[in-house]
Regions:
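The feature marks the mature, well-folded catalytic cores of soluble enzymes
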Residues: 1-177
Length: 177
């Protein structure tokens, strides 16, 4: 099943193309979501690749798991370069909530559950103000050393299964041998 936010981006792209606007995608060019958009739009640009300066109007969408602050910064820059920027760039609500929670976390360690290949998981690790740990499997989790951490927060990337999250919580709560 496709995420409703991703479906909304695809509808937005179709609308931008119908308006005759060149489409700029903010995201990782190798991410499945960005590749899917590019497959629908011939000649789409992936930031920082941009339409020529003589183009006056552009349409912008973003990978839904991008850092919301980074997307806003890039869109602001595009507004300075082009006369009209029709933006439908948005980060999915769950991703934004996770990013905000990580930014506001006051502990001294954060465990981010998710694959090392997940851009969403990597972004959560990047924006944390404290020491971060990442685990995508129980084997990776068991190799981590939390002994120097007083307050550990736990979050997960968008595609991390709830069952893995629950398994990790149960393992962390076990009595230490």
């Amino acid at each position: 099943a496709t995420c409703p936010f991703v479906e909304r981006v695809h509808r937005a792209v179709a609308s931008l193309v119908a308006q005759g606007l060149p489409v700029v995608i903010i995201g990782n060019p190798r991410h499945a979501e960005v590749m899917g958009i590019r497959g629908e739009v011939e000649g789409a640009y992936v930031y920082p690749d941009l339409p020529p300066h003589d183009i006056r109007r552009i349409g912008v969408v973003s990978q839904t798991t991008m850092n919301a602050d980074e997307v806003a910064r890039i869109v602001d820059g595009l507004r300075k370069r082009y006369d009209s920027v029709e933006t439908m760039a948005e980060v999915c609500h769950a991703t934004k909530v996770r990013q905000d929670a990580v930014r506001n976390f006051k502990g001294d360690g954060l465990l981010v559950l998710g694959s090392a290949n997940s851009s969403n998981t990597r972004r959560l690790c990047e924006i944390a103000a404290c020491r971060t740990f990442r685990a995508g499997t129980m084997q990776e989790l068991k190799a981590l050393d939390f002994t120097s951490v007083n307050i550990l927060g736990i979050t997960s990337g968008a595609s991390t299964p709830e069952s893995f999250f629950s398994e990790v919580i149960a393992w962390l709560r076990r009595p230490n041998p």
